[in-house]
């Protein structure tokens, strides 16, 4: 799951 506050695509 993507972490809130972070961009998993960058």
Swiss-Prot record:
<keyword id="KW-0840">Vasodilator</keyword>
<comment type="function">
    <text>Induces relaxation of mouse trachea that has been precontracted with methacholine. May induce relaxation of arterial smooth muscle. May target bradykinin receptors (BDKRB).</text>
</comment>
<keyword id="KW-0878">Amphibian defense peptide</keyword>
<keyword id="KW-0964">Secreted</keyword>
<keyword id="KW-0800">Toxin</keyword>
<keyword id="KW-0838">Vasoactive</keyword>
<dbReference type="GO" id="GO:0090729">
    <property type="term" value="F:toxin activity"/>
</dbReference>
<keyword id="KW-1213">G-protein coupled receptor impairing toxin</keyword>
<dbReference type="GO" id="GO:0006952">
    <property type="term" value="P:defense response"/>
</dbReference>
<dbReference type="GO" id="GO:0042311">
    <property type="term" value="P:vasodilation"/>
</dbReference>
<protein>
    <recommendedName>
        <fullName>Bradykinin-like peptide AR-10</fullName>
    </recommendedName>
</protein>
<comment type="similarity">
    <text>Belongs to the bradykinin-related peptide family.</text>
</comment>
<dbReference type="GO" id="GO:0005576">
    <property type="term" value="C:extracellular region"/>
</dbReference>
<dbReference type="GO" id="GO:0097746">
    <property type="term" value="P:blood vessel diameter maintenance"/>
</dbReference>
């Amino acid at each position: 799951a993507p972490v809130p506050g972070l961009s998993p695509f960058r």
